[in-house]
Swiss-Prot record:
Biased composition annotated in UniProt, kind: Basic and acidic residues: 77-87
GO-annotated biological processes: D-glucose transmembrane transport; signal transduction
Ranges annotated as biased composition (Low complexity): 48-64
Pfam families from the UniProt entry: STD1
Protein name: Protein MTH1
Biased composition annotated in UniProt, kind: Polar residues: 9-47
Protein family per UniProt: To yeast STD1/MSN3.
Region (Disordered): 1-117
Amino acid sequence: MFVSPPPATSKNQVLQRRPLESTNSNHGFASSLQAIPENTMSGSDNASFQSLPLSMSSSQSTTSSRRENFVNAPPEYTDRARDEIKKRLLASSPSRRSHHSSSMHSASRRSSVAESGSLLSDNASSYQSSIFSAPSTVHTQLTNDSSFSEFPNHKLITRVSLDEALPKTFYDMYSPDILLADPSNILCNGRPKFTKRELLDWDLNDIRSLLIVEKLRPEWGNQLPEVITVGDNMPQFRLQLLPLYSSDETIIATLVHSDLYMEANLDYEFKLTSAKYTVATARKRHEHITGRNEAVMNLSKPEWRNIIENYLLNIAVEAQCRFDFKQRCSEYKKWKLQQSNLKRPDMPPPSIIPRKNSTETKSLLKKALLKNIQLKNPNNNLDELMMRSSAATNQQGKNKVSLSKEEKATIWSQCQAQVYQRLGLDWQPDSVS
């Protein structure tokens, strides 16, 4: 009966890792395998088969010696070694860390392969895995820590150009209902059409409103950079911070002290009143959306932008109305002056015109006065004297042309109505008292 040798399977490898009682049992196992008749297989097969027990015996004896010489380290030494290795990894550069991790990982792989047949391979692999079990995880953690720790070493941006300071996209500043309602109402820059107004210096101050940001960019650090413009005649620009989670007082103060329409020289009281009204309206709308009354509004980006644009529109309309009012008042004064200086026929003053009974009414005093005037001005006749007197009177009247309160109130109301109608606003002009 032919008996074949057991195949070298994983089961056989597991059996090799089981502890052996003594060296004699190894020889017994080898002798039992050698008892197979030689005539049942060829010579080459027999030679290779006889060499198998010898290699297994030598491998098992080597493993036994390694087991006797191996000493398990106490847990505190293991933890201390692990901490020391981590410290060295953190102190090394990223390239050295990756090279060190790969070399240690390959070394651990070679060690596990060399000791695959040993009885203590499981213990050794578990000891190695406790330190280098997840090199990718350690590398990821080191990368994150190094990126955070190395960022302050980079030079922070303290000066930016106007193009770099302005936002590149605007889709998060407006609700989807506005952006998706009618594509024809969207400008080429992605903003709605109502952000473009035919008002005095609107484009300039719209750019200034876009420089109000809700958060700092990472490359700015903890401070707002300076906006650089080219040219001496360029207007002033600066970045302002207004977080989404801000109190009403912070929002009002930021709007009032902004650079919006600084050239119009609007009075502080008007800007403060306009900012308070804008924030109060936004609070009512926020409470209607959220259904709760918050001490500090946690605004969304569209709500936040809506507050800025409403305040900008209020002061822009006021600046436009005041500009139109000054022009209308100047034009009205010129018209009144022209009406008062209409050309009249060249006639002497009424006191000089002789009456019908001049011979009876003229006194000697009047005759003497007229004679003295003619004697003092022998080269000028009476008509020239009358024209000089009329010119002096007109010059005095020109300096005294003014408008009454009723006239100013009427002109102001007309300017407001024209601006509101031109912009399509349903606002009501101030009533004339």
